[in-house]
Structures are given as structure tokens and as C-alpha cells.
């Protein structure tokens, strides 16, 4: 498994969380190879961990992330990493 890890700066927390629940979560969950996803926030910093069953699927999503981000956040980085353990 591989994880896509986007990090964002949030400019409007309420609007960003609404967009996340209504657009991002349904969108990523329909992506080929999707396994699960978690999104977290601390103050105006957001972090996602979107798990895919293959590196190819994760890389494909990492290339789509920038086009999915609303104007209420700034995309700071996107990484693809191998998942080495889970429980």
C-alpha cells in the first residue's frame, strides 16, 4: 500500500471543512485503488493521509490533488510514501 499525504494551509476553516466533507471525501473514495483516508487539522494547518492499494494508484491521485483544492486553502505539499505498517 501507498499513502498520498497532502499538507495545506487553511484560510477559511468552516468553508474548507465543508468542501472537504462534500467534495474531497466523496471524490477520493471513488478513485481506483482507494483503501481509506484520514484528514486532520491543527489550527490553520491541514494534513491528509489517503491510502491506495498500489504505488501507481497513489501517484495518479497525487497528480490530481492540486486540481481538487478549493480557494479556501493553499496546497503546501503532496508526498507519496510507502505504508510500512498498519493496525
Model region roles, listed by residue range:
Residues 1-47, 53-87:
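Short S/T/G/P-rich N-terminal loop/turn motif that feeds into the first structured element of a domain
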Amino acid at each position: 500500500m501507498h499513502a498520498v499525504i497532502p499538507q495545506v494551509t487553511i484560510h477559511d476553516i468552516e468553508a474548507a471543512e465543508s468542501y472537504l466533507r462534500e467534495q474531497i471525501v466523496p471524490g477520493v473514495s471513488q478513485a481506483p485503488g482507494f483503501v481509506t483516508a484520514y484528514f486532520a487539522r491543527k489550527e490553520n494547518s491541514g494534513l491528509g493521509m489517503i491510502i491506495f492499494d498500489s504505488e501507481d494508484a497513489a501517484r495518479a491521485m497525487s497528480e490530481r490533488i492540486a486540481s481538487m483544492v478549493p480557494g479556501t486553502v493553499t496546497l503546501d505539499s503532496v508526498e507519496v510514501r510507502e505504508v510500512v505498517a498498519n493496525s
